[in-house]
Amino acid sequence: MNKIWKLKNVKVGVAPILWTNDDMPELGGDISFDRAISEMAQAGYQGTEIGNKFPKDAKILLRELKKYNLEIASAWFSGYIISDFEKNFQDFQKHCLFLKALGAKVVVFSEQTYSIQGQNKPLFKDKPYFTNQEFENLAQGLNKFGKWSKQHGIELVYHHHMGTGIQSLKETEKILELTDPEFVSLIFDTGHFAHAGEDIVFCLKRLISRIRHIHLKDIRKEKINELKAKNLSFLEGVKQGIFTVPGDGDIQNYPLFFELLAKNNYQGWLIVEAEQDPRKANPLEYAKKAMDYLRSLISW
């Protein structure tokens, strides 16, 4: 039996993508906002991240979340620092002020210049790469974005992501080395590192000092092999069931992962996030399954 590790100053949430996929409305498009947040609370979660079906008015959103005692942990922001800095900076400022009004402390940033994550292109074959100059430009921009957000009480966490210029451990380490730790931190996504062929415990050891937010997923290796063999896109892989909730897939070293988080005194949110087809994977059942698995390994 695994030891249960105590994580202090940690909250556990679940992302709305279990219920509705914003990138593929055919996955859960019929599931209402209220059903999603009520089931999050029913499964025992403390908070969530913002999805497309969430009210755009902060007061209305807070009122709805209060019914279920849920908080907003963060929200995704699509970055275009490399290709359209000025407009992106304005959009980022608005986004951060909205998050601040909701009581969130973290903004999830992912550079989408050249990204193929939403395109019908082979995920591994057509993965984009940034030049050294683009890395430098991105780092300078991230420092500016992160400095501004910090002044407004929001921490910028960079999201390494499949199908983007920062996908691997090596690419993630490069952008962290080029940025100021005072202004740029990391969101560690177990599913995206595992999907990229990385070992999550090895990555955690390398990156722990910069991690301020965590997404927890699991992967099905046979589905990744199928994606590679058939040259499928990222979204096609999601539809095939590459991702699932922690404990339901092929990541074997979650016990050690949580032990390292505890020993390094990780503070922040743990967000269960596993995009699947809700017709095949009932969201409430999978949210509960993930919660049961987490409670077998950690307390908070």
Curated annotation (Swiss-Prot):
It catalyses: scyllo-inosose = 3D-3,5/4-trihydroxycyclohexane-1,2-dione + H2O. Its cofactor is glutathione; Co(2+); Mn(2+). It comes from the Bacteria. It is an enzyme of class 4 (lyase). Keywords: Cobalt, Lyase, Manganese. The keyword Lyase applies. Disulfide bonds: none annotated. Its EC number is 4.2.1.44. GO terms for molecular function: manganese ion binding; myo-inosose-2 dehydratase activity. Signal peptide: none annotated. Pfam families: AP_endonuc_2 (PF01261). GO terms for biological process: inositol catabolic process. Belongs to the IolE/MocC family. This is Inosose dehydratase. It comes from Mesomycoplasma hyopneumoniae (strain 7448).
